[in-house]
Amino acid sequence: MKNKRNQGNRLLTICMVLMLAFSMLFTAVGTTENVQAASNGLSAYKKITFYKSGKVNGTIYSMKYNDRTNRYIVYASKNGKKKALLNSCSSGSIVTNGNYLYYESAAFLRRGSFGGTYKNRKLVQYNLKTRKNKVLISFRGEGLVDSVIGCDGTYLYMGYQTQYGEGMGNFAVVNLKKRQVKRLGKDCSTVQSVKNKVLVTAVGFPHGGPAYLINRDGSKCKIISDRAIKVSVKGRYIYYTEATYDWKTRKCRCDLNGNNKKALTAWSRGIAG
């Protein structure tokens, strides 16, 4: 009788160990997937704009403005077949990795000097597999709509649409898990991964704008230049052309962490570099 009880206890122990092992395995797999999604960085998501389509996993995504609704229609084309995915997009640029698509939806109110004014603004995640929308954040009151310019799966980057197209204001970092928005109050156009930082530029404005480095979550902003009209990353350096308001320019560079700024040319008329 005692042996049977011991055998039963051993069997129960083995079952518990196996259950714990399976639990740890599934937890580890989930964590690995999340880490991999984040480690792909900003290159995992493609930016699609109303004037430039983009290809992700064999599908071409494009946008077209609907004058009647004051919104964009988002299309997907593959193997010669084109279909409308969304007709409620208010953002002039969106991002997708082929699984999810991020955009803002809002009701247009009126036009202004620096862009349209909207109400009922919402940041939305669209699941391309289930074709369902999920509202992540609802914004209060009237205001400008954000264009989405980048995403790494954990953080999403966007800025207020203006009349300049690629030039956007009040750059924001969205924590997708916590659904929190951090506004930096700076202009923006592009985002790019540089080592463990994010390089933000505002080169979409005709007069240029700030170039700066941030942590992925938007913290510790470091200004590289207050008015850069061209920015590129090559090898161990960030190269940028900065300008004055009377259109003198010079080409400069700095280390990938924003240190050791160096002018490569003297100030001159025209665009340096």
PLM feature spans:
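Residue position within the beta-strands of beta-propeller blades
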Residues: 60-64, 102-105, 156-160, 199-202, ...
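Sec-dependent signal peptide cleavage junction
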Residues: 24-40
